[in-house]
């Protein structure tokens, strides 16, 4: 299992805006432990991902569809690695040529 670097960003932001306390500390520590375990399985957003995300953004805009930039960046990473994507927000990725799985509805 891999995770896109954009997901690391999203989770880090969520943890940093949480009120300080036991829950925030528990979740932050757990996430750091997870990152240490998968450190070589974090897919970065590089030039190829940027080009693919730009193409997707342009196609969406031509169709009048506006997407969240972070989701489009994740899509670029998924397309670069020809990967499958597990997400709760499967409708955000219904126009990419990749297998998208919603584990919450399976």
Range-by-range predicted roles:
Residues 88-92:
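C-terminal structural segments of small proteins and small subunits
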Residues 79:
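Short alpha-helix at the nucleotide-sugar/activated-sugar donor binding site of glycosyltransferases
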Residues 1-76, 95-98, 104-106:
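PIN-domain endoribonuclease scaffold, especially VapC-family toxins
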């Amino acid at each position: 299992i891999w995770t896109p670097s954009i997901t690391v960003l999203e989770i880090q932001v969520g943890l940093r805006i949480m009120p300080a306390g036991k829950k925030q500390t528990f979740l932050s520590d757990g996430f750091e432990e997870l990152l240490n375990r998968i450190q070589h399985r974090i897919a970065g957003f590089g030039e190829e991902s940027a080009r693919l995300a730009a193409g997707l953004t342009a196609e969406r805009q031509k169709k009048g569809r506006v997407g969240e930039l972070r989701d489009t960046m994740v899509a670029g990473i998924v397309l670069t690695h020809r990967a499958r994507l597990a997400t709760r927000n499967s409708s955000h990725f219904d126009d990419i040529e990749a297998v998208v799985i919603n584990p919450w509805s399976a």
